[in-house]
Regions:
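Aromatic-anchored transmembrane helix interface
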Residues: 47-53, 70-86, 91-114, 153-157
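A membrane-periplasm/extracellular boundary helix in multi-pass inner-membrane enzymes
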Residues: 187, 191, 209-258, 279-282
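Long extracytoplasmic/lumenal interhelical loops at the membrane interface
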Residues: 146, 260-315, 320, 336
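Hydrophobic, aromatic-rich transmembrane alpha-helices
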Residues: 3, 7-12, 28, 51-66, ...
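Alpha-helical transmembrane segments of multi-pass inner-membrane proteins
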Residues: 107-110, 114-144, 149-212
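Transmembrane alpha-helices of multi-pass inner-membrane enzymes
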Residues: 53-56, 346-353, 362-400
């Protein structure tokens, strides 16, 4: 396949960085304003409800041409808006939470208008995101800035900002300064005490370093398949590992580095997994179709698979998994065409899926950070441009 995405061929206009670069750091900072636990507790309401609805209305108002090309998504969004508005008025309404979580899954589509078209502008915007996240990380780790926020929540917010380095490194793996900043952020993130984040940092770094072999189709598919299945496999691994020599070794590391020894290596999660399995398997109807409400409104299973299965059932979970597979397959088309930016977004999304083994914040739960959906929106935007470019090229060949 011709590498149509290389050497800035995706640029609509060659030249200076476009103003749209500012949207990437703005969306990152919005995660702190509308998506954090601190804001929810301070205002007594979940402002991400209003944000998601607002962004969808913006999509309808200013992106009509794209909606006409993808009317299926447009009508689906429209049909969900009205019941969401009604349910938002109900205090702690379970159905409202479920619809809210379903709307969140559409964010990669409705955030696409905010994504720049060309490589240069995207890179500039991502540098801006990295700078903001490193500044916040420095203030948090050394001066206690926002120190009263949940440490895991801060870990996600900070990591998914500086993770933009993964995209930049995918384009230039020999840039020593980018690796220095990456290592600095990793050390500083240890302050959050999040083992999940530490693992995510290591995973993204390995995916960048092993970009060559991972770009092979069968290796790529093995990696994303395992990442999708890992939240399902992890509860069994955690349960079987308790009491083994490996568990004792990990317990020592947990106590010395992360100061979380009291809850064990997994902070009591195996017990939560057993309870979640009981709830999900209460009846075959619940097992297949779910409860139609979010688990996090009353119970935290700390596992992305259990959260989805409880809310949407096995059938709904398989539909969501199918959507993720579709996303990764389209991403590979871009990677195969030489698109390093899409490869970096792929690496970040793999780390996000691995984090779902012991957390459930990505899908089927409250909106904690916009950034995973921003990285997905980058891929969607680039894929749409790529397809249009291929159509134009094929049209020219036919004319000739």
């Amino acid at each position: 396949m011709q590498n149509v995405l290389r050497d800035n061929q995706m640029i609509k206009k060659k030249g200076d960085v476009q103003l749209t670069a500012i949207w990437l750091p703005v969306l990152y900072l919005l995660s702190f304003i509308v998506c954090s636990d601190a804001v929810r507790f301070s205002f007594g309401m979940d402002l991400s409800f209003l944000f998601v609805l607002g962004i969808i209305f913006f999509y309808f108002a200013f992106y009509k041409n794209h909606i006409s090309k993808a009317s299926f998504y447009g009508w689906w969004i429209y049909l969900l808006i009205v019941p969401t508005l009604i349910m938002c008025l109900m205090k702690d309404g379970d159905m409202g939470h479920m619809i809210h979580c379903t709307l969140i899954m559409i964010l990669p589509i409705v955030l696409e208008p905010f994504i720049p078209h060309d490589d240069k502008t995207i890179s500039f915007g991502l540098y801006f995101v990295v700078g903001v996240s490193l500044l916040l990380l420095f203030l948090y780790a050394n001066f206690g800035f926002l120190g009263n926020w949940n440490t895991n929540c801060m870990g996600y917010l900070l990591f998914l900002g500086f993770a933009a380095l993964t995209v930049l490194l995918s384009k230039n793996r020999k840039n020593v300064w980018l690796w220095v900043f990456y290592a600095y952020a990793f050390v500083q993130l240890l302050v959050t005490g999040s083992r999940n984040i530490s693992i995510a940092v290591i995973i993204t770094a390995l995916l960048v370093l092993l970009k060559g072999p991972i770009s092979k189709k069968w290796v790529y598919r093995v990696i994303y398949t395992f990442a999708i299945l890992y939240p399902l496999i992890f509860p069994w691994i955690a349960t079987e590992m308790v009491g083994t020599a490996l568990y004792e070794w990990l317990a020592e590391i947990t106590e010395t580095i992360y100061d979380k020894g009291q809850g064990g290596v997994f902070s009591g999660r195996p017990k939560l997994y057993l309870e979640a399995e009981k709830l999900i398997g209460e009846s075959w109807v619940h097992y297949l179709f779910g409860y139609g409400r979010t688990m996090v409104s009353f119970y935290a299973a700390h596992n992305g698979y259990y959260v989805l299965h409880y809310t949407y059932g096995l059938i709904g979970t398989l539909v969501i998994v199918g959507a993720l597979i579709y996303f990764f397959e389209k991403t590979f088309i871009l990677i195969n065409a030489g698109d390093s930016i899409s490869y970096g977004c792929f690496a970040i999304m793999i780390s996000v899926l691995f984090q779902q083994a012991s957390e459930g914040w990505f899908l089927g739960t409250y909106l904690i950070t916009l950034m995973p959906f921003v990285y997905m929106a980058i891929v969607i935007k680039r894929y749409r441009i790529y397809i249009q470019k291929r159509k134009n090229e094929n049209g020219k060949e036919k004319d000739e």
